[in-house]
């Protein structure tokens, strides 16, 4: 049941620090009522998933669902999908905001330019995109595939947080 599922998510949050819990959601399955959708929206908001992969039900000829009564229109499926995607974006942003001002570790993956400046970017354990100003490193130094830690500063983009340059150290 949804109550059992939420309880499982609560247990994960109790025993693991800041876990990135994600889910997939199909909107507009045949027979889904406005009330069903409202319950789903309330549930996904209560659980506060870090990310939701939201997609519309897609009718496929020859499947049991193709013959089910209560097929929804594409516009209803699109609207419901849009509502959940917006909810997911809000929850994702709130999840990322929780690390601002806190020490975090990042596995550096690659170098990229963002708004005309050069950064080394990577992911935290929670899959939050982090940027480190490239000029923090000595010329010729390659931090790729190394772990660094520092204090999370501010949002560089909607989905990427920059580390405070004075706090960055390599993790041995």
Predicted region positions:
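Conserved non-cysteine loop/helix-boundary elements of the Radical SAM core domain that shape
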Residues: 1-51, 57-76
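Terminal RNA-binding accessory module
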Residues: 67-172
């Amino acid at each position: 049941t949804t109550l059992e599922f939420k309880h499982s998510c609560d247990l994960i949050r109790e025993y693991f620090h800041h876990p990135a819990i994600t889910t997939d959601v199909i909107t507009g399955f045949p027979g889904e009522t406005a009330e069903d959708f409202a319950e789903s929206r309330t549930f996904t908001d209560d659980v506060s998933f870090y990310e939701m992969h939201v997609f519309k039900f897609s009718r496929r000829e020859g499947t049991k669902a193709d013959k089910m009564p209560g097929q929804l229109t594409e516009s209803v499926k699109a609207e419901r999908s849009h509502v959940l995607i917006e909810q997911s974006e809000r929850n994702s942003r709130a999840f990322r905001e929780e690390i601002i001002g806190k020490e975090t570790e990042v596995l550096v993956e690659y170098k990229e330019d963002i708004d005309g400046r050069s950064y080394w970017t990577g992911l935290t354990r929670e899959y939050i995109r982090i940027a480190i100003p490239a000029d923090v490193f000595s010329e010729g130094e390659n931090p790729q595939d190394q772990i660094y830690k520092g204090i999370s500063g501010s949002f560089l983009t909607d989905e990427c947080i920059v580390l405070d340059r004075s706090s960055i150290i390599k993790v041995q």
